[in-house]
Design a protein with these regions (language model features):
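Flavin (FAD/FMN) cofactor-binding and adjacent substrate-gating region
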Residues: 1-8, 75-81, 102-182, 190
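Helical element adjacent to the flavin cofactor pocket in flavoenzyme catalytic cores
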Residues: 144, 166-220
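Flavin-dependent oxidoreductases
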Residues: 202-280, 423-424
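Glycine-rich FAD pyrophosphate-binding loop
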Residues: 44-64
Length: 523
């Protein structure tokens, strides 16, 4: 499994697992940028906050970000204006601008050393295939941005890529893990209750409480900040209906060192679909570039290593002096109308998801919106991002397209001809789905050659998981749940681990491994 640059440089947190019943004003589920920022802002207001995460704080998608702080959304401004109207389009971009300003305020107020840098952003014609984008309309995009009050301009040749672009000057770069480490310290100093390796299991009502294992956090308000929202008080059926409006995509990134060049220090996003993105920042004596893209539905790429290889090849063309030092991938959640879902889903319960490629900005904005909801303060983005907002014209078609994966993979996996029991178990450091005694098993062999197995059936809605060779995870192709090599839940919408394989089935599997070893030696 690859590790992001942020994770390599992060300060390791160490908080206890919840081991008693406690009481708080607000319980926050999920310790990424949304959850930690929410806890920080609420504790600043004097509220008693309990923050829990199923692993370590910041170890989820926040640590796999490429950390672009921008108000330029994945859905183009012209498209936002066409679908929602100019005022709603302005509100969406203003949300990102507000989030950047909020992070800047916190960095200054707390004197956070997080490599904060103001940088320009360029939405540009792609490095390759530029003839296909002759009618790019970037001049119109820039003109509309100016009309709506944003400092944008059209340029004939963006730095680094040398292509026509819309330039926005007031974006930013930072180190997300260093930033969040300080926020965590402040929450603790203000009496916050922080628990790691504490997995949510339910939300009770009357009185309200978050259940985690054998213990409860009694609270007046719950903020669900878990990338893909857990079921909460809405119930499983309503949760499944809501989760079906979310589409999980995997995105890949490579990090590289390169000689210092002040002109190159900026952010870049091309017009491809899926698009490639680049950010270059000063780091010590050198510059550091992060180049990403190659997005696909989670669990649906047979050879994820190829995604990294293709990115490295293209980066070498754009920045020939770049020396790749890091690889990592992350997951982004898309919605059917291109806007996030942020708001209350029932009384006393707030969710935030669907940030697409703007997780750092929308995550920060969601924290501010959660604080406003708890304080009963009017918020200008409430209607635009509300989870129950009406579907726009294009949304039903996008919904059908994104949800076709579920029946397609169910049919493919369960109606395919039955295979005989497989003999060869995975090689060291790999996994494969095997059919053993009529069971579909997710079989993993660690570097020491030890076999472990669990059910290959995703506990969310029953699809079969796939082995991700690049990240050493089991990924569900239907709704994007991800599991560790031995079946531990990493990301929802599933809320349980893959069921462990024990007893006769595991013994049978190990016997298969011994038989295969004998066959290999005989050959």
């Amino acid at each position: 499994m690859y590790t992001s640059r942020w994770s390599k440089e992060a300060r390791q947190t160490s908080f206890p697992t919840l081991a008693e019943n406690i009481t708080a004003d607000v319980a926050v589920i999920g310790g990424g940028i949304t959850g930690i920022t929410t806890a920080y802002l609420l504790s600043q207001k004097g509220l008693r906050v309990a923050l829990i995460d199923k692993a370590r704080f910041g170890s989820g998608e926040t640590s796999h970000t490429t950390a672009h702080l921008t108000y330029v959304t994945d859905t183009r401004l012209l498209e936002l204006a066409r679908v929602f109207g100019k005022e709603r389009a302005r509100l969406v971009w203003d949300a990102g601008r507000t989030a950047i300003n909020e992070i800047a305020r916190i960095v200054s107020a707390e004197s956070i050393d997080c490599n904060w840098q103001i940088a320009a952003g360029y939405l540009h014609v792609p490095w390759l295939k530029r003839s296909e984008f002759a009618n790019h309309r970037l001049d119109e995009e820039a003109a509309l941005a100016q009309e709506l009050g944003f400092a944008a301009q059209y340029v004939q040749a963006a730095p680094v890529v040398g292509r026509p672009a819309m330039m926005v000057p007031d974006q930013a770069l930072f180190h997300p893990m260093q930033y969040l480490a300080t926020l965590i310290d402040r929450v603790v100093a203000r009496g916050g209750l922080l628990f790691e390796n504490t997995e949510y299991s339910d939300i009770e009502e009357n009185p309200q409480a978050v259940v985690a294992g054998d213990y409860r956090i009694r609270c007046k308000y719950v903020v669900i900040a878990t990338h893909v929202p857990v079921a909460g008080k809405t119930g499983r059926l309503r949760a499944l209906s809501f989760q079906s409006k979310l589409a999980p995509y995997s995105s890949y990134a490579v990090g590289a060192e390169l000689p210092p060049d002040p002109a190159a220090r900026a952010m870049f996003w091309d017009l491809n679909n899926p698009y490639n993105y680049l950010r270059v920042e000063a780091r010590g004596e050198n510059d550091y570039a992060i180049f990403g893209g190659k997005d696909h539905k989670t669990g649906q790429e047979a050879h994820p290593e190829h995604c990294y290889e293709e990115l490295e090849t293209l980066l070498a063309e754009i920045l020939p002096q770049a020396r790749v030092t890091d690889r990592w991938s992350g997951q982004v959640i898309e919605t059917h109308d291109g806007l996030p879902y942020i708001g209350e889903t029932s009384e006393g319960q707030f969710i935030a998801t669907g940030f697409s490629g703007n997780g750092m900005t929308f995550g920060t904005l969601a924290a501010r919106m959660a604080c406003d909801a708890i304080a009963d303060v009017e918020n200008p983005w409430l209607e635009a991002f509300h989870p129950t907002r009406p579907a726009m014209l294009r949304a039903p078609w996008t919904y059908l397209k994104e949800n076709f994966d579920y029946p397609r993979y169910l049919v493919k996996d369960y109606l395919a001809p039955k295979e005989r029991d497989e003999i060869k178990t995975p090689t060291a450091g790999s996994g494969k789905v095997m059919h053993i005694n009529g069971n579909r098993l997710a079989v993993y062999c660690n570097d020491a050659g030890e076999i472990s197995a669990c059910s290959a059936v995703c506990p969310h809605l029953g699809c079969l998981v796939r082995w991700n060779s690049a990240e050493q995870t089991w990924d569900c192709p239907c709704h994007g749940s991800r599991f560790g090599p031995e079946g531990k839940l990493m990301a929802g919408p599933a809320e349980k681990t893959l069921e462990p394989c024990t007893g006769e089935a595991l013994d049978h599997l190990k016997e298969k491994q011994r038989e295969a070893s004998v066959l290999i030696r005989a050959e």
